[in-house]
Amino acid sequence: MEYLRIENDFPRISHSAVTLGKFDGIHRGHQKLVEKIIEQKQEGAQAVVLALGTASRTILTKEERCRILEEMGVDILLECPLTEKIRHMKAENFIKEILIGDLQVSYVAVREDFRFGYERKGTPAMLKEFGKKYGFHTEVLPKEMDGRRKISSTFVREELNRGNMEKFRFLMGTDFSVEGIVEHGRGMGHKYLLPTTNLIPPVEKLMPPNGVYITVSHFRDRSYQGITNVGHKPTVGGEKFIGVETYLFDCNEDLYGEYCKVDFKKFLRPEQKFSSLEAVSYTHLTLP
């Protein structure tokens, strides 16, 4: 999959099937839209995701978004920051200049509540009207719902901020996870029967509340259940950055330097300060 961040002009793409939105988290609603443009590849179209205006703190990192979309079959991810030009572009001009002119769109998939263009005056009805005139088809999908609430990035963020890993999993179709190279910690966990891995999440990634979670950690060809502390490691003085420290059950390996992906399953309790590392060891080993 090709990833392009739009700084000035859009690339010229021929025969594209496009879906538009923020796409900072690929939740169930986004997935339905992506599936629609993937279907158009059978007609010779390139499947293009146009992500409009990503937040400074995102549910998924750029790497995670790219991997998920590539696995789904997307050909091109265009990330378009909300520059002055884009913010003040009339919806009609957005359709003519970008969708028709630059992307040579043959198919567009959007949700029924999608809005775009200056003052958010662009609507699915407008896309359909222009499609009839300029020869592209617009498919409008209903909102994906959880009960009476629309599934949206805002909904996902709220549940993540609550530490509700089960609801996050339902909305996204996958676990919340943190991944990266295992860092060297202070080397004290092993002394107190706490073999651990340490990860530093990217600064742009939204994190759940500080606390202790049930997790599963994945390394190349093996996985370990464990518990993970998200926070400032208060027992050992407290770092100024958020750390993800995981105790792995039934693991005696030296995993420093390995690539690790930690899937969060359930919130256990808030982060708390212990009187000693011995107390930490005892508490962790006796958790249900």
Regions found by a protein language model. Give the residues of each.
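Residue-level signal for inorganic ion chemistry
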Residues: H27, L69, V108, F168, ...
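Short acidic-hydrophobic, aromatic-tinged amphipathic segments that line or gate anion-handling sites
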Residues: E2-N8
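Phosphate/ribose-recognition catalytic cores of enzymes acting on nucleotide-derived substrates
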Residues: G185-L285
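Glycine-rich, Lys/Arg-enriched anion-binding loops that position phosphate/diphosphate groups
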Residues: G131-N229
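N-terminal catalytic cores of NTP/NDP-binding nucleotidyl/phosphoryl-transfer enzymes
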Residues: D9-E63, R67
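Residues at the starts of beta-strands that form the adenosine-phosphate
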Residues: Q46-V48, I76, H137
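N-terminal Rossmann-like or analogous alpha/beta NTP/dinucleotide-binding catalytic cores
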Residues: G53-Y134
